[in-house]
């Protein structure tokens, strides 16, 4: 543990074995888990709020949960576990809120093929998560001859009707956040970072990068009030992109789109044509070992379907997995917050087969990197989902004691190898 939030912290530098206040490492671990999960909720609530959607119950809970982590407030382990699970419950509410706000503003996502090539002409590359920022940029660039490209978690934007209607939203450039320094350096146009997942830029592209909203970078112009004039003018002044052919990625399998296939899916399961579903997704990152997810999906048998979301999908969304009776074997459900869609599909299947989610032929193999992923994990635990595999490593803020509780109650486990995990899951 490490805690230095009060004046009496050990040695004036930090408590590392037990708190001077009396809290042990497990309480400290759960307090960290609560705070980290609340950060994830805050991100989703911020996006929903920008679209005019708010939930007073979520706001009130955030105050209550933060209060529990103050010095000398609560030393009860079980109460801390309850609060951590309630973080998951509130994250479910806020993901639903954000999904509803996105659909009301931009329409329900629909399966869409997205080009990874480039068009001749000036371009702007948009990274992050904020669909409203992208919409405003598209509106302001209409008729300018500037093409707009998505990057990273912005890929699913192409599936929303009110965004895809802009003909100058032409494709997706690059991959996940950790590759941006190379990809942004190679992209000759202007670059806009809208939320988290920006990195301190290299000098080679700093002067043509911009941030807006919550994002900020040193030496980079910050756009206020969604007036993207400086970005547009910069794009016009830069060398145009060349026409380059690329492949295609498919996104847009929002739960509304997937549930339209529910009859086909149920029939395929009953006929033995679909043996198992895998949710393989979450965050991507630079840590070695994430090739596990590529190899895992490559080795998934042909009678299984893979659902994915978040930027972790870039490890395998280029693979052509084909289909089963017209049902794509790889279904990209969207951004990390579209974990809500995955849950809706799981609940609908459980209802159709008259069983619990844990009794479905469904396995979760998650990749995590940051705080939103922790909030989603807590949501899954709140719902009682068991047998989740997580990687590439377990969270450092979970002590052996807390991890033991999660393993005993939920059978939460680290990934091992694709071969071993598939064998254990499928038998």
From Swiss-Prot:
The lineage of its organism: Bacteria, Bacillati, Bacillota, Clostridia, Moorellales. Its EC number is 1.7.99.1. It is found in: Cytoplasm. Its cofactor is [4Fe-4S] cluster; hybrid [4Fe-2O-2S] cluster. Belongs to the HCP family. HAMAP family: Hydroxylam_reduct. One of its GO terms (cellular component) is cytoplasm. It catalyses: A + NH4(+) + H2O = hydroxylamine + AH2 + H(+). Hybrid [4Fe-2O-2S] cluster binds at residues 129, 153, 197, 283, 311, 336, 370, 372. This is Hydroxylamine reductase. Catalyzes the reduction of hydroxylamine to form NH(3) and H(2)O. It is an enzyme of class 1 (oxidoreductase). One of its GO terms (biological process) is response to hydrogen peroxide. Keywords: 4Fe-4S, Cytoplasm, Iron, Iron-sulfur, Metal-binding, Oxidoreductase.
């Amino acid at each position: 543990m490490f805690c230095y939030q009060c004046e009496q912290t050990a040695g004036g530098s930090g408590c590392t074995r037990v708190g001077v206040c009396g809290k042990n490492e497990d309480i400290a671990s759960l307090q960290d888990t609560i705070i980290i999960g609340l950060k994830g909720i805050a991100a989703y609530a911020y996006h929903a709020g920008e679209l005019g959607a708010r939930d007073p119950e979520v706001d009130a809970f955030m105050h209550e949960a933060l209060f529990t982590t103050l010095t000398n407030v609560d030393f009860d382990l079980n109460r801390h576990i309850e609060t951590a699970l309630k973080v998951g419950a509130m994250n479910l509410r806020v993901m639903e809120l954000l999904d509803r706000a996105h659909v009301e503003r931009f329409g329900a996502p629909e399966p869409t093929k997205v080009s990874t090539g480039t068009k001749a002409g000036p371009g702007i590359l948009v990274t992050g998560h904020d669909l409203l920022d992208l919409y405003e940029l598209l509106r302001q660039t209409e008729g300018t001859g500037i093409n707009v490209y998505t990057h990273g978690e912005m890929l699913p934007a192409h599936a929303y009707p009110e965004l895809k209607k802009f003909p100058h939203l032409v494709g997706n450039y690059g991959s996940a956040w950790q590759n941006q320094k190379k990809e942004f350096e190679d992209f000759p146009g202007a670059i806009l970072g809208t939320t988290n997942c920006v990195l301190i830029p290299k000098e080679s592209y700093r002067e043509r990068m911009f941030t807006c909203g919550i994002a900020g970078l040193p030496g980079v112009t910050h756009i206020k009030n969604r007036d993207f004039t400086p970005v547009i003018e910069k794009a016009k002044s830069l060398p145009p992109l060349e026409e380059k052919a690329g492949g295609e990625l498919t996104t847009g399998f929002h739960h509304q789109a997937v549930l339209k296939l529910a009859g086909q899916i149920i029939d395929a399961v009953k006929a033995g044509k679909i043996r198992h579903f895998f949710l393989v997704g979450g965050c991507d990152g630079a840590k070695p070992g994430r090739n596990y997810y590529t190899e895992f999906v490559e080795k998934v048998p042909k009678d299984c379907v893979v659902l994915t979301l978040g930027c972790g999908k870039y490890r395998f969304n280029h693979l052509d997995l084909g289909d089963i009776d017209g049902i794509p074997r790889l279904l990209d459900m969207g951004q990390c917050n579209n974990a809500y869609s995955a849950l809706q599909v799981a609940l609908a299947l459980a209802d159709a087969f008259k069983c619990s989610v844990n009794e479905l032929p469904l396995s979760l193999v998650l990749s995590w990197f940051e705080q939103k992923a922790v909030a989603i994990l807590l949501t899954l635990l709140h719902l009682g989902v068991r047998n989740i595999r997580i990687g590439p490593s377990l969270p450092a803020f979970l002590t052996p004691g807390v991890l033991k509780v999660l393993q005993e109650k939920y059978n939460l486990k680290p990934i091992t190898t694709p071969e071993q995990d598939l064998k254990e899951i499928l038998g």
